[in-house]
Amino acid sequence: VSKGNKDIVVATATAGNHGRSVAWGARRLGLKCKIFISEFVSDERAQAMTNLGADVLKVKGNYEKSLIECIKQSTENNWQIVQDVAWKDYMIVPKYTMAGYTVMMKEVIDQINQNNISHIILQAGVGGMAGAMIAGVARYLKNIPITIVVEPDSAACVMESIKTGKIEKIDIKRESLMGGMSCGEVSLVPWEILKNSVK
């Protein structure tokens, strides 16, 4: 991109929010963008990404199926994956994404008296935002508040992984109302934080 190559195609799998940010960035840089979504993503979320110039591809199945299809087609077509989920040999972009999430914690700290924070409640998903916020708490706060990580009972990949001490895959049989939280496996990068900080 920095050399003026506008033929780059970026791709990601999403339930909505991450895909919107990738579509926005691609449009800003003049790149083509392919967004893979599961059949459970609402038409409104898909349209929001289309409105940003992305080509949205609906995949039969859940989020994990859309991620598998994204990786497959990206490999076949030489597209650049911009994913917030880490796996073996794909860690850099998810680390940058998590670093961006820590800005939210810094903004919170800058706006309130940090001694007044007693509890922080975080969504789990694949663990990226939760792991980043926990790292931000450790970095920016003197007094560590009680931190609660929540996830749907039908997609409790963080809780099940914490129980066994290793990443567990959840076969999601029932989608959550919060589609973006319906994730079956913890991302490798945040797992290194979550396994040592969540009970």
Positions of the model-derived regions?
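Conserved PLP-enzyme active-site core in the AAT-like
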Residues: 107, 128-132, 137
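Rossmann-fold NAD(P)-dependent oxidoreductase module
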Residues: 21, 25, 48, 111, ...
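A short, small-residue-rich loop immediately preceding and capping a beta-strand
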Residues: 1-37, 116-129
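Glycine-rich beta-alpha junction loops
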Residues: 86-89, 124-128, 151-156, 177, ...
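Short, acidic/small-residue loops that bind anionic groups at enzyme active sites
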Residues: 31-48, 140-154
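Short acidic/glycine-rich loop or secondary-structure boundary segments that cap or lie
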Residues: 129-131, 155-159, 180, 190
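A glycine- and small-aliphatic-rich helix-loop capping segment at beta-alpha/alpha-beta transitions
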Residues: 24-34, 135-144, 166-168
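Small/polar-residue-rich loop-to-helix segments that shape phosphate-bearing ligand pockets
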Residues: 34-119, 162, 166-199
